[in-house]
Design a protein with these regions (language model features):
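Positively charged n-region of N-terminal signal peptides that target proteins for export
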Residues: 1-10
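A residue-level marker of the well-folded mature domains of exported/periplasmic proteins
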Residues: 3, 21-359
Length: 359
């Protein structure tokens, strides 16, 4: 009996997940945090917020960025986290379907995996998912354009184009479908015209959410359709996020558009560059997803896993990664415009005035 107790205690200590007062006690449990890239502002903020809040909660943190969306780098980094003794993995995948093999090792070592913001597909190693309500993000964007164009009562037609994100990012489909759940009836009725003819997700996708790729595609659309201040009128662009919206802005400014004739343009993430574009009249709105809130939620989930207590989730039906429904916690997105950006971004301490000052 004594031998069994000694072995049990040794196993518990070996996990590094012994807690007193809610904080790691035995040498600080190490949490692996894998982010996709540092080339987009939002992932720098996500990583920094995650690291700061996990460390404040008493954990050691191994934070890694996978170059510029380099899948082999991310796989190698996750392998190193597993070998290096991380007790929980928090992963924002570059490609939601590219981590199946490496996560078999995580499961074999009983390491829980939290998919962060992007759902990891086709892996039964995924324990939980933490994100924002991604379908609702698209709904908010669609509702914004519907209301600003007065689609319910205006005669129209209105010319609109669509641009969304990376095909490997499971969220991109939710954003796109959320927006179309509002806009498609008007497209079908002819009140909204997509003159490029590019209406499907595949036609509107942007590899790696790249600003440069978005700009190239939109320059081609402008040229082929004849959009311009003195050409065919463009009323609105539904862009799923800020990096693609910035590509659209670059293309339209290059075509001669100014604040005076700029079409409605949506976005997401409240990147500094896009907030500045809002102030310049070159973007209409963005979705604010406070990464501090998401990071705090992940810390709660990690701590619950470590304590063996119930992990907080609020969705057990929406997100199926191909192996089953993944228990999820979805934070609420809100939209930012010139009317409320100060309250959301400045007063909350997310940015300073200097961060988004327009020169």
């Amino acid at each position: 009996m004594k031998k069994i107790v000694i072995i049990a205690v040794a196993l518990v200590l070996a996990t590094g997940l012994v807690f007193a007062g809610g904080k790691a006690d035995a040498g600080k449990a190490k949490i692996g945090v894998s982010m996709p890239t540092q080339s987009l502002q939002r992932w720098n903020q996500d990583g920094a917020n995650m690291k700061a809040q996990l460390e404040a909660a008493g954990y050691a943190v191994d934070l890694q960025y996978a170059g510029d969306n380099d899948i082999p780098t991310q796989v190698a980094q996750i392998e190193n986290m597993i070998v290096g003794g991380c007790k929980v993995l928090v992963i924002a995948a570059i490609d939601g379907s590219a981590l199946t093999e490496v996560l078999k090792d995580a499961k074999a070592n009983d390491i829980p995996v939290i998919a962060y913001d992007r759902l990891i597909m086709n892996s039964d190693a995924v324990s939980y998912y933490a994100s924002f309500d991604n379908f609702k993000v698209g709904v908010i964007q669609g509702e914004y354009l519907r209301d600003k164009l007065n689609l319910k009562s205006a005669a129209g037609p209105f010319n609109m184009e669509l641009i969304t994100g990376d095909p490997g990012d499971n969220n991109a489909g939710f954003f796109f479908n959320g927006a179309l759940s509002i806009l498609k009836p008007y497209i079908d009725s002819g009140k909204i015209k997509i003159l490029s003819g590019q209406k499907t997700f595949a036609q509107c996708a942007t590899p790696s959410w790249s600003t440069e790729e978005a700009q190239k595609r939109f320059e081609n659309i402008v040229t082929s359709v004849g959009y311009g201040p003195k050409g065919v009128k463009l009323d609105a662009v539904m862009a799923s996020n800020d990096s693609t919206a910035q590509g659209v802005t670059n293309a339209l400014v290059g075509a001669g558009y100014t604040k005076a004739n700029f079409p409605l343009l949506t976005g997401q993430d409240c990147d500094k560059a896009s907030v500045k574009n809002m102030l310049l009249g070159l973007q209409s709105m963005s979705i604010f997803k406070d990464t501090r809130t998401l990071a705090a939620q992940v810390v709660e989930m990690v701590t619950a896993i470590a304590k063996g207590s119930t992990v907080p989730v609020n969705d057990k039906k929406t997100y199926d990664n191909g192996t089953g429904i993944i228990p999820s916690f979805l934070c609420e997105p809100v939209f930012a415009t010139l009317d409320n950006y100060k309250e959301l971004l400045i007063d909350s301490g997310y940015y300073t005035e200097a961060d988004i000052a327009v020169k």
